[in-house]
Amino acid sequence: MRIAHRELGSGGISTNSWTYSAGGESAFLAFNPDDPRYVLGGSYQGTIEVLDYKASAGTNVMAAPIQYLGMDAKDMKYRFNWNAPIIWSKHEPNTYYHGSQHLLKTTDMGKTWKEVSPDLTRNEKEKQGKGGGPYTNEAVGAENYGTLSYVIESPSEKGVIWTGSDDGLVYVTRDNATTWQNVT
């Protein structure tokens, strides 16, 4: 859901003020705050909905357009968290980052993606079975372990990006993803 602004003379914000936004039921959203025409919203399996508010239309994009249904996480090209992080870069025009076990980068609204990091998780294969397993196997490929759960770009220093994984690692790059340092 989104709201453009508080409506003057309306007595406040009501349920009529809200409109649909991109992504699934719980997801990261990313957009350029100076031009919020496009909103990128995440969903499970690394799917991102790109919503164009001017055209009132959207499309789904993926770094690897593969259906991971029923696959073990260790066999997936990219392991995405249910709420995989997506951020807009304030330092690089038209650039968005998306976290799997790698940090992925797009400069064309998700048509193409480039890996800009090595695996930034512990990559423990014995913990990369069916999603949600062994106790609540959901077989959708959405509940994976060994994924990035947070990505943040420095608001003041170009080229500085931090990541956090669900298996406890924190990495930083200070040279625009050329090298990464484990600072856990």
Question: Which residues does each PLM region occupy?
Answer:
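Beta-propeller blade termini and top-face loops
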Residues: 1-184
